[in-house]
């Protein structure tokens, strides 16, 4: 299975400043997509622009969250249907920053996954432990709970779901998990997916996310069971994001 290099722009980018980045990605797509799949998840305000610029390039566009309801009194939220209409085909769900900043529980993430798939969005479900949880030796316990709570029945049935392992202590800190840490956690996640979904669990891509950059991408992407990368800050630079994609070769 081809690796997936996904860029999470987080709360960064304006229409006026994103055009050149999107154009650079579009221009590089024929070369960049030789060995991997690529995806960017800009802020919701930029989804339509990104979808327009990248149309036909092979680089896909996603969102950073969606609400579980189709419509209603949910001020500030966006439904999966709205995101699809804007041009999204993917959605990040359960990112540690949403779990932290918005108090999202795994049960909420599960409902969002169900809603996303109803409208054709492919979910990237994030799991990962904090520094305190790792220090106390509970990293597999925490991630196991998150997998069980966040993934609905049938998540792996059509190999259309993606997991992103993001050690919370490595996100935006410049710290990166060691290759040994990544190998251990990705092997554990694969075991949990097979335990929960049977052989279908072997078809789920497991991305690594946590300060991925050109300097460490090759070593991380060579780790067994690493099916790609969820890239944060480095995805805001076309040069860096494309270098990470090149490392997947």
UniProtKB/Swiss-Prot annotation:
It comes from the Bacteria. Its EC number is 5.3.1.1. GO terms for biological process: gluconeogenesis; glyceraldehyde-3-phosphate biosynthetic process; glycerol catabolic process; glycolytic process. Pfam families: TIM (PF00121). InterPro entries: Aldolase_TIM (IPR013785), TIM_sf (IPR035990), TrioseP_Isoase_bac/euk (IPR022896), Triosephosphate_isomerase (IPR000652), Triosephosphate_isomerase_AS (IPR020861). Keywords: Cytoplasm, Gluconeogenesis, Glycolysis, Isomerase. The active site is at residues 95, 166. One of its GO terms (molecular function) is triose-phosphate isomerase activity. Homodimer. PANTHER family: TRIOSEPHOSPHATE ISOMERASE. This is Triosephosphate isomerase. It comes from Granulibacter bethesdensis (strain ATCC BAA-1260 / CGDNIH1). The lineage of its organism: Bacteria, Pseudomonadati, Pseudomonadota, Alphaproteobacteria, Acetobacterales.
